[in-house]
Amino acid sequence: MKRFIRELNSFVKGIILFLRPGVFFFFLSRPLLFVSNLLSLTKWVSHQKRTGILNDFYRPFRNHADRFKLYENITAKYGLANEHVNYLEFGVYKGTSFRWWVNENKNPDSRFYGFDTFEGLPESWGTYAKGDMNANLPSIDDTRIKFVKGLFQDTLFGFTDSHSIDNGIRIIHIDADLFSSTLFVLTTLARHLKKDDIIIFDEFNVPNHEFFAFKMFTESFYVKYELIGAVNNYYQSAFKIV
């Protein structure tokens, strides 16, 4: 029976390849992918705890400033204000969240790295066009910081080869927006991840982008994690590697 099923599957797949339905129906691929990822997201949400952590689900309207409540909660819960941390932020823009973490942490051994093209999005994202959200390097007076300008795909390999980021508590803040950028960052840093590392997402509940990238990454690399906080219906979410 199993052999028959395998042969039938192979035969049907061959027929489909021969007929090439993608020539006529490819326009459906993006909306179908969105529906698939949205269903995965809602299933994921149904399994997340809402007690014992900061989690405001459900709320009818989003307040982007509440992301700072998430940062404050994480900092207080894990005593990060005075700990030695390596903070890596991907998608700095004007440096608002980057500056918050620099000001909050007082440990002189901590290091803060901000990655961005500073020339805007490398590809379109939702209603944003390629090149939107460009900004100048933020002016922050602190010797512990360093900005890495360029595409993540061009800069991150060289950075990990030349910088030690395995000491202290590692905080990875992903505000990359895009599926491609998010997946690249996660897979590149996979070999560095260790227990208790913290990963924060700024647009996590966007089905086809940060959520999809995180789902593919954790499933492909067998990464175990737990949710440690979320605001704005999981738009901003934080996880700890376990």
Q: Which residues are covered by each model-predicted region?
A:
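Membrane-proximal basic amphipathic "stem/tether" segments
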Residues: 1-61
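S-adenosylmethionine/decaboxylated-SAM
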Residues: 48, 52-57, 72, 76-242
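Conserved SAM-binding loop and adjacent beta-strand
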Residues: 58-70
